[in-house]
Structure formats: C-alpha cells, structure tokens
Amino acid sequence: MALERTFSIVKPDAVAKNHIGAIYNRFETAGLKIVAAKMVHLSQEKAEGFYAEHSERPFFGALVSFMTSGPVMVTVLEGENAVLKNREIMGATNPADALAGTLRADYADSIDENAVHGSDAVESAAREIAYFFADEELCSRTR
C-alpha cells in the first residue's frame, strides 16, 4: 500500500446544507487524515481554471456557475491509497447510481449538484492540490 495525498472539494450544495462535518467524519473514519483545509468562494476565473479540461463540454458553463454559487471547502486528504479510498467514499458521480452509504448517495441531489469532488489519480491530485494550496499550507500528520 502507498501513502498518498488526494484532493477533495465539498461543493456549494453540501456546504449550504451544513454537511461539512459529516463528510469530514466519513473521511476520518475511513482512515484518511485532513492535512489542509480551507473555505473559499471560487471566482469565475478560479473555477474556470480548475475545470479547464471540461471547457469544451456542454455542461461547462453550468458547472462553473454552480461552483461559484456559494463557498466550498477545499481539502487535502492523506492516507493509504487515498485517491481510491476517497473515490470509494464519494460513490458514483451520479447519486442515482451511487451505492448506499456513500457521500453522494447520502448528500447529493443530482448529477449536477453532487456534493463532492475528488481527484481521479495521484497525478491529478498533485495538480489540484497545488492549484489551491502552497506547500507550507500542507501539515504533516505524524501523530
């Protein structure tokens, strides 16, 4: 097993419903440690930059609009196989397809407002972490 870091966003819908603590509890219960976290209200420019890979997709405008509609929690998680573990905790992108007990099954209303984002690979995690956090903001959890 590999100790990894992954990136997570608690999206505006879940923040508005006060699900931050419950979502963080799921991460920690599953053995992931929070090594950085902050609440931010994304600007249009910041959201467009983060989701640039989707800029040609038909849902891009709606995605940016949603992600700028309220504050989000950006978080760095650390643990054994953190990327895969976080994706399992989140569940399928479409909450209608998500297994019971996953974050999206429990907290998401639709595929468009699906509560959480998580990196899909170690490489994208590193890129996404660097987009929101400086190295000195990441706190090693040795205890």
Swiss-Prot record:
Its EC number is 2.7.4.6. ATP binds at residues 11, 59, 87, 93, 104, 114. GO terms for molecular function: ATP binding; metal ion binding; nucleoside diphosphate kinase activity. Signal peptide: none annotated. It is found in: Cytoplasm. It catalyses: a 2'-deoxyribonucleoside 5'-diphosphate + ATP = a 2'-deoxyribonucleoside 5'-triphosphate + ADP; a ribonucleoside 5'-diphosphate + ATP = a ribonucleoside 5'-triphosphate + ADP. The keyword Manganese does not apply. Major role in the synthesis of nucleoside triphosphates other than ATP. The ATP gamma phosphate is transferred to the NDP beta phosphate via a ping-pong mechanism, using a phosphorylated active-site intermediate. This is Nucleoside diphosphate kinase. It comes from Pseudoalteromonas translucida (strain TAC 125). The lineage of its organism: Bacteria, Pseudomonadati, Pseudomonadota, Gammaproteobacteria, Alteromonadales. The gene is ndk.
